[in-house]
Amino acid sequence: MNKYTWLFVFLLTVTIINYPNPFNAKAGQTTTFECTTDTAFNSTLYIYDMTARLLFKRDLPMNAGANHFGWNGYTEQNELVNSGVYLYFLTDKNHSRVGKGKVWVINR
């Protein structure tokens, strides 16, 4: 019998930020999401309004390290969102890795 029992814990981490925040989609600005992850995986970006209505969804391949992708402030139906705060979530297919945050759109 082995005297030692080894426990390996693999931490699958996702760090995500976006900039500029706030941004003016009406003036043609986009916000850039910067996602840093420790392993490659296929992900999905979801953007919701504050009533939990899904406005935007995009499947994105993630590489280990830094990844960059943008959002122009338009829904999947190509409609400009109103000024306000929106929630974003980045998940893998099992929803076991989650990056999340808020993005503020100011349309003037």
Where does each model-flagged region fall?
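Short, glycine-anchored, charge-dense loop/turn motifs used at functional sites
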Residues: 48-55, 86
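Short beta-strand/loop motifs in extracellular/secreted proteins, especially
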Residues: 41-44
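Short, surface-exposed loop/turn motifs with a glycine/proline- and acidic-biased composition
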Residues: 60-95
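Surface-exposed loop/edge segments in extracytoplasmic proteins
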Residues: 53-59, 97-99
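C-terminal tail/sorting-segment detector
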Residues: 14-20, 26, 32, 83-108
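Aromatic/hydrophobic beta-strand junction motif of beta-rich domains
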Residues: 29-38, 71
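Sec-dependent N-terminal signal peptides
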Residues: 5-12
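Non-cytosolic beta-sheet module surface loops
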Residues: 34-39, 49, 92-94
